[in-house]
């Protein structure tokens, strides 16, 4: 099966009747879902792609295939736990059945404790510290996923990205039309930061430690006063901040509310030549 148009038609039709699917479903539907997940796993297709105009196009049918796999796959024993223990899940490890030759061909590092679920793509020269990459995600070349970082379902991580320790990149499977969380090329995401709900961090941006960005987070450019929602502009340097709250009924000052603050914007050359710590100093 090589025709993506035909594959998409089968997935779309099956999803319209997904309530009828179960672990006993065989034939064309199961074969198509498994084939689609294998293509995602190899990086031959991806849930979202950046267009020439900078906008991201979401392939909803691929998310549908991922969702249907939960109905089709039975729970089963997954080996590899500590002290010869097991897990109990529907989605196998990406590395299930891999041998030394498979890892050499894939050409990325996977440190003990790294968990990657089948259908997530890991590109060449990626480093996976003890971390978690969920199904349908895409991690591009020469990116570092540091210790205890999490890449959510269908998230798109660009080239030369550094996700620091404890970073959380949210997954977005539903609603189907929603964009996944996206970290574009050459971004640095500081320790314990969270980017969720389909937000986009544009190319070359730096998020300091402990920055939290969701769809309702106000992202304020300190120099211009401009407010962004759901997207950090390219080559922005962002730190945690707060906004004055509304007065309380008794007239006293209300509690401040969290926001993210763009403290500066840099061009590509400055970003390449300047250390992260220097960029975050003010």
From Swiss-Prot:
Record protein name field: 2,3,4,5-tetrahydropyridine-2,6-dicarboxylate N-succinyltransferase
Main location, first listed in the record: cytoplasm
Catalytic activity from the UniProt record: (S)-2,3,4,5-tetrahydrodipicolinate + succinyl-CoA + H2O = (S)-2-succinylamino-6-oxoheptanedioate + CoA
Statement: the UniProt record of this protein carries the keyword Lipoprotein: no
Binding site for substrate: 109, 146
Family affiliation: Belongs to the transferase hexapeptide repeat family.
Record's subcellular location: Cytoplasm
Origin superkingdom: Bacteria
Pfam families reported for this sequence: Hexapep_2, THDPS_N_2
Pathway assigned in UniProt: Amino-acid biosynthesis; L-lysine biosynthesis via DAP pathway; LL-2,6-diaminopimelate from (S)-tetrahydrodipicolinate (succinylase route): step 1/3
Keywords in alphabetical order: Acyltransferase, Amino-acid biosynthesis, Cytoplasm, Diaminopimelate biosynthesis, Lysine biosynthesis, Repeat, Transferase
GO biological process terms held by the UniProt record: diaminopimelate biosynthetic process; lysine biosynthetic process via diaminopimelate
InterPro entries: DapD_Trfase_Hexpep_rpt_fam, Hexapep, Hexapep_transf_CS, THP_succinylTrfase_dom1, THP_succinylTrfase_N_sf, Trans_hexapeptide_repeat, Trimer_LpxA-like_sf
PANTHER family, per the entry: 2,3,4,5-TETRAHYDROPYRIDINE-2,6-DICARBOXYLATE N-ACETYLTRANSFERASE, ACETYLTRANSFERASE
One Gene Ontology MF term: 2,3,4,5-tetrahydropyridine-2,6-dicarboxylate N-succinyltransferase activity
EC number: 2.3.1.117
A GO CC term attached to the entry: cytoplasm
């Amino acid at each position: 099966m090589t025709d993506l148009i035909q594959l998409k038609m089968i997935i779309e039709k099956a999803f319209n009747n997904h309530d009828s699917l179960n672990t006993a479903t065989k034939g064309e539907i199961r074969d198509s879902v498994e084939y689609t997940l294998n293509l995602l796993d190899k990086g031959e297709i991806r849930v979202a792609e950046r267009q020439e105009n900078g906008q991201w196009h979401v392939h909803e049918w691929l998310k549908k295939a991922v969702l249907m796999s939960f109905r089709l796959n039975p729970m089963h024993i997954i080996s590899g736990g500590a002290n010869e223990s097991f897990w109990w899940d529907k989605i196998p490890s990406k590395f299930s059945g891999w041998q030394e030759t498979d890892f050499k061909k894939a050409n990325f590092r996977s440190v003990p404790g790294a968990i990657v679920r089948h259908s997530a793509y890991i590109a060449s020269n990626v480093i996976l510290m003890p971390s978690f990459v969920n199904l349908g995600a895409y991690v591009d070349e020469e990116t570092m996923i540091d210790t205890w970082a999490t890449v959510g379902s269908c998230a798109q991580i660009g080239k030369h990205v550094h996700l620091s320790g404890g970073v959380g990149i949210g997954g977005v499977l539903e609603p189907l039309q929603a964009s996944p969380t996206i970290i574009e090329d050459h971004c640095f995401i500081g320790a314990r930061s969270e980017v969720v709900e389909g937000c986009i961090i544009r190319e070359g941006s730096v998020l300091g430690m402990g920055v939290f960005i969701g769809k309702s987070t106000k992202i304020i450019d300190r120099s211009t006063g401009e407010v962004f929602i759901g997207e950090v502009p390219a080559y922005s340097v962002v730190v945690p901040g707060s906004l004055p709250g509304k007065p309380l009924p008794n007239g006293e000052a209300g509690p401040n509310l969290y926001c993210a603050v763009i403290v500066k914007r840099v061009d590509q050359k400055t970003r390449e030549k300047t250390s992260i710590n220097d960029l975050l100093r003010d």
